[in-house]
């Protein structure tokens, strides 16, 4: 049974990555950043757990412009190298890659003055969710916002195994425990929920 769940999860992630790379996106970063979060030019953004494709980081770097900064943070150094190459190819010199372990509070070495912090499809890959929310809170400046996007509890075979997914109610509780206040909930896609918080 465990093997079957693992295989389903792997197949789902492969399908997900293929969709994202071919443009048939499950998530639309531009819509989320411009229409839901409404990130303005010149903002500072931290994408915690950016991943190899770095959809949030790359989209944010285009929006915030030369006067803004985007920190693409991840624990895998090869991922960061890939993201940096994509940014340079796109001429996005305001994007900076940062190695970190998000499950250790204080490990992310960037200024604690982030306007918009993102935890996007990252929680399901981790164990210490509380530490991740504490780190997000530490980095976000007073009045700044946190965006959480995660897989819905039951969204079919696409994505990670069900037992790895973090329910919306749990994410909401964890964020509020560290001091964030909920601004709004939204449908990030048919397969993802979204939560927007303010510090």
Where are these regions (language model features)?
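Conserved class I S-adenosyl-L-methionine
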Residues: 145-174
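Conserved alpha-helix/loop element of class I SAM-dependent methyltransferases that forms part
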Residues: 23-44, 57-59
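Class I SAM-dependent methyltransferase SAM/SAH-binding core
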Residues: 44-106
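Core SAM-dependent methyltransferase catalytic element
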Residues: 178-199
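Short, positively charged and aromatic/hydrophobic N-terminal segments
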Residues: 16-17
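A short acidic, Gly/Pro-enriched loop at the edge of an enzyme's catalytic core
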Residues: 40-43, 103-117
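A short glycine-rich, Lys/Arg-flanked "PGG" loop and its adjoining helix->strand segment in the class I
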Residues: 61-65, 130-145
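A short SAM/SAH-binding and catalytic strip from SAM-dependent methyltransferases
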Residues: 114-129
